[in-house]
Amino acid sequence: SRGLGDVYKRQPYDRIETDFKMIRDAGMNVIRIAESTWSTWEPEEGVFDFTHLHRMLDCAAKYELNVIVGTPTYAVPSWLAKKYPDILAVTHNGKELYGHRQNMDITNPDYLHHAQIIIEKLMEQVKDYDCVIGFQLDNETKPYDTCSKYAQAKFVEYLKNEFPDIDEFNREFGLDYWSNRVDDWDAFPDIRGTINMSLDAEYKKFQRKLVTDFFAWQADIVKKYKRDDQFITHNFDFEWHDYSYGMQPEVNQYEAAKCMDIAGCDIYHPSQSSLSGREITACGNIARGIKGDNYLVLETEAAGNHPWLPYPGQLRLQAISHIANGACMVEYWHWHSIHNAIESYWKGVLSHDLRPNRLYKECSVIGNELKKYGHRLVNLKKTNRFAVIADNASLTGLNEFKLNNESDSNYNTVFRWLCDALYLMNIEYDVIPADPALFASYENILVPALYSATDDVLNALNEFVANGGNMVVTFKSAFSDEHLKIRHDVQPYIINKALGMQYDEFTLPDNVTVSCGGKSSKARDWMEMVDCTTATPVAMYEHKHWGVHAAITENSYGKGRAMYLATLFGEDTLIEALKLFFGEQKNEFDASYPVVIKRGTNTQGEKIIYLLNYSDDEQTVTCHADGLKKLCDDSTVSAGDCIALAPWDFSILYAD
């Protein structure tokens, strides 16, 4: 059913009854507890005290609140770090010190031994509570750049399994360069010293596998205790650019989630006049793509960081936007603003005075609205015609070989460039891995900077176009193989056939302009000197010397078409190029941003349409379809009717 809730942390004084009653009265029905509480449950080795846990669970049952219990393993107690100093990770930057969270070596056997004990002890305490609906594994887990003796020994075994022939390993990674050759696995050098980007990228891939294995290990422990009606999840997060931005570089979320029942995520974003809905959509689509299904928002801001205090109405719009994107739950980090330590100014629903306030009242509006019609919004299913590929290996590749050393632009910059353009065009899209088995499910695929790819993936993209698909590919695609070895053939490798273009020169733009559809913008960060073979130039570089080369091309190949974007340029120009390629994407309201349209089918088989106003001004849209009704009052909306949307407001329509 509907889910709106909070992460509950202990207070500076006892008010659990007051808090849980307030949570219930606000229409919230879920709390998340127990993560980062290891030292509370086990204040010294072998001494356990779950008094506060039972008080929370008993009170949750009293107020009919559902509970998600987190395993408390992402913050280690001081006694554990003192007894086993090697638990603190050794990284590229040296040895970690005790104090902050997520500073441990997740391959350390002493850490894993004691983590298993506390997980099992916790599970024994909670297994008989009906109010516990699920379990969260750890918290925003990463490998924490562990380069310990345990991790590096596992890496060598991983390589030996991948490359039984050590000579093949040396050839594949180009280790004869700079006298880096390895001829004895037992003499494998410390990975922290490598200058070989292929080897470094392989270690990062291995570190992602450590996270996958860590989750599978925890899930196996939890499964010994969980009931069939309980779920296992995790709060996956994203690359951080002062807020959630794009694909997480340190976790292969597709693989990591295989041991889970439902994917969860933490999405934070700008607010006030900067609230655009972009992060809710881009990161939410990543989350929905992790298991190809609905997901849980296990954390998002109520107030959060200083600039994020929402305008009136924005909190409600944000919650509905998550649900419109396929989320089945929206939880706030956190219930109340805390009074000590590093996140003292990461504001919760309640401020430091713990009194009902504006945000609490707005949460109450959301919660009580969802009581009425949440059952018709939850588990929204989408059938999107567009997909954007997100690829861990390519992300790593562009971290190893930056686009521009003078810029912060990276893989996620290119990923979000395409995603945000689709969003502003009111085109809903899925985010998928570079898995050929998924390509045929879509009519249109966008490929941002697929720097690292196998022959099979590239041939599958050619086949997708040949069979009638439409494909947009950006610069820095098909440049290296899966181990970051640069291809020694025409670039972009293999897919130049579908694209009908090629290049062998590239540089950084210097006063270069790209124009399309009446919009012009400066090229930035990277440009390729593209020559058309069978493609038609859509836009040439506007430059005295580089004007002979194409910046945007379009090609017919088999039954389909392909566009290539040879440089990074302004959003308005990109939107014009995509309109030219895909055609105008009409909707039944002819609405354009800042009115965002999302849609799907609910469990009852009704078509649900969301009209979301992401602006500080009233917006009016005209309906061009019959047979629609407003969810709030069942009033009919017919062709020609106008719907007014107040600032930061929304309307939900349905059709049988």
Where are these regions (language model features)?
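Short, small-residue-biased leader/transition segments that mark boundaries at the very start
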Residues: 1-8
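Short, well-ordered coil/turn segments that N-cap beta-strands
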Residues: 2, 27-29, 61-67, 128-133, ...
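Short, acidic/polar
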Residues: 10-23, 244-256, 311-319
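Aromatic- and glycine-enriched glycan-recognition loops and surfaces
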Residues: 10-24, 44-58, 117, 210-217, ...
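Aromatic-lined substrate-binding rim segments of carbohydrate-active enzymes
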Residues: 17-24, 32-92, 218-225
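Polysaccharide-binding and catalytic clefts of secreted carbohydrate-active enzymes
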Residues: 92-262, 266-273, 277-280
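Carbohydrate-binding surfaces of carbohydrate-active enzymes
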Residues: 185-188, 216, 224, 228, ...
